[in-house]
Regions:
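N-terminal, polar/charged subdomain of small-to-medium soluble alpha/beta proteins
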Residues: 1-98
Length: 98
């Protein structure tokens, strides 16, 4: 599984990168070659005035692609929640293909 992490207006620390890799490998690693790649996009505070909320979007490339996203101030917590949601979405997409 190829993992790409893109960050805009958010510091991508080594700890956050390691956390992302660990959580996504744990959640999606079991799907093997059915998952082509995973793209994670992190972006800084949004323009609607919320205090420091950051956006995380995870796109899992397979047929069809699975996309989950959420906004929260704690990126570590968002990654935890979204990795599980992405895994459920991939499971559902694979079951629909059968």
């Amino acid at each position: 599984m190829k993992l790409k992490i893109r960050s805009h207006d958010v510091e991508l620390s080594d700890d956050l990168r390691a956390h992302l890799e660990r959580r996504l490998n744990s959640a999606l690693g079991g799907f093997g070659d059915q998952v082509d790649s995973v793209v994670v996009r992190l972006s800084g505070p949004n323009g609607d005035g919320k205090n420091g909320d950051k956006r995380c979007q995870i796109v899992v490339r397979l047929q069809p692609s699975v996309k989950v996203q959420e906004t929260d101030a704690d990126l570590f917590a968002v990654v935890d929640r979204l990795s599980l949601r992405a895994a459920r979405g991939v499971t559902h997409a694979i079951e629909r293909r059968r």
